[in-house]
Amino acid sequence: IMTAVIGPRDDGVISCDSMSEEFEPWKQELGENIPSGENWLAWLELLGEPTPHWSNYVMGSVRHTQMFEDVRYGFNMSITSSIPPDSGSSSSSALAICGMFAVRLSNQLDTDAEVMTYTTAEAEWFCGTRGGMMDHATMMYSRDDSVLRLTFNPFSQQAIRLPKEMSDVKFATLFTHPSKKGSEIKRAFNELAFVAREVVPRLVPKNWQDNWENVAMELPEKMSREEIVNRWPNECKMFEKMYPTLFDINFE
């Protein structure tokens, strides 16, 4: 569980600390590095990847909100968390959600679950990852007595109440290795996102669900960079902008 104690401010300062000694306190100003334009991905491309720091997950939410909303006030935020960091258990997404709640509550902006899900998923790209919004949707829509059914493209969510016979059942996730998003892990993470979001949808037919077993058998096990360039030459510039850690050499 991650808990955030949030205090609105009447100035543009953002001040955050953690109860864990591993994460040092920090402060930033709303007026520093204000996003320009109306295209989040284009601004991130100009900005480049920030130096790794836990503040990035909060400031990604702040900067994304600044691009699309009227943000005048900062906030104080103190974080307490039992989610093990660098474990693959979505501590980074939880922190981004806390940051999004903080900036939106402090500026009296909408905190509807769907708004929070979409905006925070994009905001986390500030850190260099290009993940989707499953973690964020799970955090916003989960219920204590239910399992959550999510679909994407189009997005839908449904909380399915557990039967009484399962009221005492506990679910646990086991992690076998660390997931610190350094350069190699981040590249592998973004590669999975790229394959799932860009490659597979371009390879399967429209009604693939009707014959998914045969469709799956026909998918290639791997594709080289050259095969991707040759197959979708008109998409390469977009790939390069969206996934710079994968395509750090120009396609030209």
Region roles according to the model:
Residues 40-44, 62-63, 67-84:
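Glycine- and acidic-rich phosphate- and metal-coordinating loops
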Residues 1, 89-109:
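DPxDG-like acidic metal-binding loop motif
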Residues 42-51, 81-89, 123-128:
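A short glycine/serine-rich beta->alpha loop
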Residues 67-76, 103-119:
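Phosphate-handling active-site elements
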Residues 3-56, 64, 146-252:
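C-terminal nucleotide
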Residues 10, 20-22, 79-85, 103, ...:
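Acidic, glycine-rich active-site loops and adjacent beta-strand->loop/helix elements
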Residues 110-157:
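Alpha/beta catalytic cores of group-transfer enzymes, especially the acyltransferase/condensing modules
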